[in-house]
Amino acid sequence: QELSRRISTATGIKATTSLTAVVDALRVLGIKRPAIATSYLADIDARLVDVLQQSGFRVAGIRGMGLKRSIDMGKVMPEETYRLACAVARAATDADGIFISCGNLRSFEAIEPLEKDTGLPVVTSNQAGLWQALRMAGVQERLPNLGLLLRDY
């Protein structure tokens, strides 16, 4: 959030980051205990948990794919992302939402099925970034098929 503020101050233009958008999306959906699916290695997952805890969230569970290279993250099919997110949500029985972290994961196709099958709201890095960029640009149009966040907020 500090980076976004510094960019905005220096340029006079609204700015955001993926993580700022995610935090705002989790808050607007009322998610306090996310179950998190990532493409990352354990050390990156641990840093993500720290940042989210510092932002007031209690991470209900996290599971990563253990991928190192961005190119490999981009090759993950949405069905794999769906399965991982379902598994971490099932394991984290007190989760009140799902967060899929990684801008390289093809997660858009998994959002609606996850929300339907788990009954939990879903936030992904790319979905949150799109949502925040649209709202910052003054676009209020609701988008179907991309989950509760873009459909209702």
Give the label of every model feature segment:
Residues 1-153:
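Non-catalytic structural scaffold of enzyme domains
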